[in-house]
A protein has these predicted regions:
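Intrinsically disordered, low-complexity, charged terminal extensions of DNA damage-control enzymes
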Residues: 1-142
Length: 142
């Protein structure tokens, strides 16, 4: 008798709402925690669960942002070895970000993400709305 291969455990599914927050020239990103999946990398702001447009608007206002326009984006999925992210997204135009005083988001020119703030490919469905290349893509071209 040959040893039997253990069956793979099903991946854990995490629902997320990804936000592409812009003020015209700047976009919001934030740093991921130092431990865990994609540790220490930058990401687009995202929230647990699939939020409605009204829930997203409420969250933005709680963060001290003033949304002008919001548009729903297509759903996306990213598969890691042990986790699947099932994502929905919104692109949000807000008033000037210069006066934002929140603690965990950075507002940068999207081109700066290419060199200084690489964003993981897990967010590729939404980074197109920033018109930037992802962290890995800049190395693939060389």
């Amino acid at each position: 008798d040959y040893p039997k291969k253990a069956q793979k455990k099903p991946r854990k599914i995490e629902k997320k709402t990804v936000l592409v927050i812009r003020d015209g020239s700047s976009a919001a990103i934030r740093k991921r925690p130092a431990k865990g999946l994609l540790a220490g990398l930058y990401e687009l702001p995202n929230l647990s669960g699939w939020l409605s447009q009204d829930e997203v608007l409420d969250w933005l206002k709680q963060e001290g942002l003033s949304p002008i326009r919001i548009r729903r984006l297509l759903d996306a999925k990213h598969i890691f070895s042990h986790i699947e992210w099932h994502m929905t997204g919104y692109v949000v135009l807000v008033e000037e970000l210069e006066n934002y005083s929140g603690k965990d988001m950075l507002f940068i020119e999207p081109k700066r993400t290419e060199e200084e703030y690489p964003i993981p490919a897990a967010f590729s469905a939404y980074t197109a709305y920033l018109q930037i290349r992802l962290g890995q893509e800049k190395y693939d071209e060389k």
